[in-house]
């Protein structure tokens, strides 16, 4: 009987140590598919939010979505945490890398862009993306790989 209890306990310890990746995330972060996520309520502009995320954990950044399932998880997390709001994600046009072309197919050689850059946010009510000036304030979600 003692041997059975000992072996059962051993299997339980092994099972618990191998199950789930939630243990890889800090206790106040949420885990999904090997990544850790946390919404933050203090509004920041896009650059300050990205900088803040890099300081939270090694490899941290504003959230980036690799699938609709991941986006659904993060949108639900943001809504459950703060209700209706908008949240920055890591997508932006800060470096103005768009390949613009004139309607007559001529290459864009002369540029006179305003200093405004645009960054992407999502609403916590759906996972539809929108852009706005990066200088605007919004809540945000940080992410790092567990």
Swiss-Prot record:
GO molecular function: calcium ion binding; toxin activity
C-type lectin domain boundaries: 24-146
InterPro entries: C-type_lectin-like, C-type_lectin-like/link_sf, C-type_lectin/snaclec_domain, C-type_lectin_CS, CTDL_fold
Function: When linked to subunit A of IX/X-bp, anticoagulant protein which binds to the gamma-carboxyglutamic acid-domain regions of factors IX (F9) and factor X (10) in the presence of calcium with a 1 to 1 stoichiometry. When linked to subunit A of IX-bp, anticoagulant protein which binds to the gamma-carboxyglutamic acid-domain regions of factor IX (but not to factor X) in the presence of calcium with a 1 to 1 stoichiometry.
Disulfide links within the chain: 25-36, 53-142, 119-134
Tissue-specific expression: Expressed by the venom gland.
Protein name: Snaclec coagulation factor IX/factor X-binding protein subunit B
One GO cellular component term: extracellular region
Gene3D superfamilies reported for this sequence: Mannose-Binding Protein A, subunit A
């Amino acid at each position: 009987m003692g041997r059975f209890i000992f072996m059962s306990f051993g299997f339980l310890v092994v099972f618990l140590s191998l199950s789930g990746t939630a243990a890889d995330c800090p206790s106040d972060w949420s885990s999904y598919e090997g990544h850790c996520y946390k919404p933050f309520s203090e509004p920041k502009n896009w650059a300050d939010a990205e900088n803040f995320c890099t300081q939270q954990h090694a490899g941290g950044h504003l959230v980036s979505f690799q699938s609709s399932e991941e986006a659904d998880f993060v949108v639900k997390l943001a809504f459950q945490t703060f209700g209706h709001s908008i949240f920055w994600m890591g997508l932006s046009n800060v470096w103005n890398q768009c390949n613009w072309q004139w309607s007559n197919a001529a290459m864009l050689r002369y540029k006179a862009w305003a200093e405004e850059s645009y960054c992407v946010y999502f609403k916590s009510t759906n996972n539809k993306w929108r852009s706005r000036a990066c200088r605007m304030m919004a809540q945000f979600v940080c992410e790092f790989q567990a």
